[in-house]
Amino acid sequence: MSPTPKNAVSPLDSGQTSPARHLSAESPPDLQEQFERLRERYQRCTTSLASAAHDLKTPLSIISGYVGVLQGEKLGALNDRQREVLGDMASSCKRLQNFIQDFLTYSVLETGEMQLRFEMGDLNESLAEVCSLWSPRFQEKGLALYFLANEKITPFPFDAPKVQRVISNLLDNACKFTPTGGTVWLHADPYMWDRRSTQPSSFPNDRRQRSLSAPNAIKVSVADTGPGIGPEFHLEVFDDFFRIPQKSSETDGTGLGLAIVRRFVSAFGGKVWVESDAGNGCKFSFLIPLAPSSPLDPSRGPKK
């Protein structure tokens, strides 16, 4: 699959911001008052969302634990029908746990409480770990998942758990929307990032850029053979709670997965974008600076 570079868009260059985030000091007093009310309401909603998610986490963990006990036949042998029902219950519990984790992560990002921990690590190992965790789900759906390790990537300081969360969200997105029989690729390459360019993927000679002997970033990409994303959604797809209109409701989600990706990558000091045409698959890429810059406040929207 080779997405069209001309349709690559980075939300970090679009001037996107979260609602109720910034207002000029020169704004009229009545507008400032409305802004403050809106911001307070937004903060209350975020707090309530986090509280509800946290309250659901414990009972759901208990239910999931009991389902695991039953599946292990520790309380007696199971017939085929019982195994099927318990399998459905386990899948439903997992989906709910993912929803709850998205809400909790989002609330942490909104309050600006997330902390980054940059430590020397092997990115190939981190990506391989994520692929191993996701491999069973891809196999269950009949999808091929390929990870292309790159020996040119040497250890560098990065926040491994959060990079893995970004990859997990991108793989989750690819798994949801790629039809059975499809293929998903994960790969990373050393990259020379020209920060003056608004479109990382539209460099005149991308292959030459990536082969330079002194890269300043790592480009990580997740590509799939799914239905793709029309250019009209390339910016909105990274918005909070946004979901692309679907003809069917076969896929579920919170609409936060890619928004969390955007927030994390922004906090790294990196850049994220999508390359896709409707009907021609999708490729999400993000850049991790090899030398971490001052971490950004992940609750803030990207600067214009």
Per-segment meaning from a language model:
Residues 36-75:
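Primarily the dimerization/phosphotransfer
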Residues 83, 117-122, 139, 144-154, ...:
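Conserved catalytic submotifs in the C-terminal HATPase_c
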Residues 91-96:
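Short alpha-helical segment of the dimerization/phosphotransfer core of two-component systems
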Residues 107-118:
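Helix-loop junction within the histidine kinase core
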Residues 174-175:
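Short helix-loop "hinge" at the ATP-lid/N-box region of the Bergerat-fold HATPase_c
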Residues 211, 215, 229-241:
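Short conserved segment of the HATPase_c
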